[in-house]
Curated annotation (Swiss-Prot):
Annotated organism of origin: Laribacter hongkongensis (strain HLHK9)
Pfam families registered for this protein in UniProt: PagP (PF07017)
UniProt protein name: Lipid A acyltransferase PagP
Example of a GO MF term: acyltransferase activity
Region ranges (Disordered): 26-50
Job description of the protein: Transfers a fatty acid residue from the sn-1 position of a phospholipid to the N-linked hydroxyfatty acid chain on the proximal unit of lipid A or its precursors.
UniProt keyword annotation of Membrane present: yes
Catalytic activities: a lipid A + a 1,2-diacyl-sn-glycero-3-phosphocholine = a hepta-acyl lipid A + a 2-acyl-sn-glycero-3-phosphocholine; a lipid IVA + a 1,2-diacyl-sn-glycero-3-phosphocholine = a lipid IVB + a 2-acyl-sn-glycero-3-phosphocholine; a lipid IIA + a 1,2-diacyl-sn-glycero-3-phosphocholine = a lipid IIB + a 2-acyl-sn-glycero-3-phosphocholine
EC numbers: 2.3.1.251
Length: 206
């Protein structure tokens, strides 16, 4: 009988149903180790967005406007592409674009040329034509004091045959430069007896 009571007591103690009597030894239950804390997540600061195309364009114009460097423009040649014009038109049109212009210019950190300018010259009909705008050229330097450029100009002009109503123009630009003097030119596209004109001028850095 005494042996049966001991078995029952041991079973109840194992299940945790009864408190141990004085003198009874209860085996220690090993503690479950706590899970390690997750490492703190570091916040990554939001990177500042690069300026867009329009903002960069405006910054270039504004920086060029603040430049203290000036250059003089002297219109030199107007050439009507003979492949697109009848002979009588060639004989009729003016190809001596007398005029004058002035601009502000700068070279950026990459060595490229920027300018804001205004120019007046005689058009194909011997009428005064104004042109004002912004210009940019990628510059290559094949030798000391020699520069080659290619880029574009965007601006506003007005012509007598369009009642001097202003209209925008985007045109290509190329140049050959030596020290402070440059020969610069653009080509105006068009159709038969219209457009297809090479227009060139001298540019002198003051």
């Amino acid at each position: 009988m005494k042996q049966m009571v001991c078995w029952l007591t041991a079973g109840l103690l194992t299940l945790g149903g009864l408190p141990a009597r004085a003198g009874d030894t209860v085996p220690a239950v090993p503690e479950t180790p706590a899970a390690p804390a997750a490492p703190a997540v570091q916040e990554t600061p939001a990177s500042s967005a690069a300026p867009g195309f329009w903002q960069r364009s405006w910054d270039n114009v504004e920086t060029t406007w603040r430049s203290d460097r000036y250059e003089l423009y002297l219109p030199a040649i107007t050439w009507h592409n003979r492949a697109f014009y009848d002979r009588d038109k060639i004989d009729e049109y003016n190809e001596h674009p007398w005029g004058l212009g002035l601009g502000r210019y700068r070279y950026d950190s990459d060595g490229n040329w920027h300018a804001l300018y205004a120019m007046f010259f005689l058009d194909s009909h011997d009428k005064v034509e104004p042109f004002a705008g912004y210009a940019w050229q990628k510059i290559w330097r094949p030798a000391d004091d020699v520069r080659l450029g290619a880029g574009f100009t965007v601006g506003v002009t007005a012509r007598s045959d369009y009642s001097y109503i202003p209209f925008p123009a985007i045109l290509p630009l190329v140049s050959v430069e030596y020290r402070r003097l440059a020969l610069q030119a653009t080509y105006i596209p068009g159709g038969h007896n219209n457009g297809n004109v090479l227009f060139g001028w001298l540019r002198w850095q003051l």
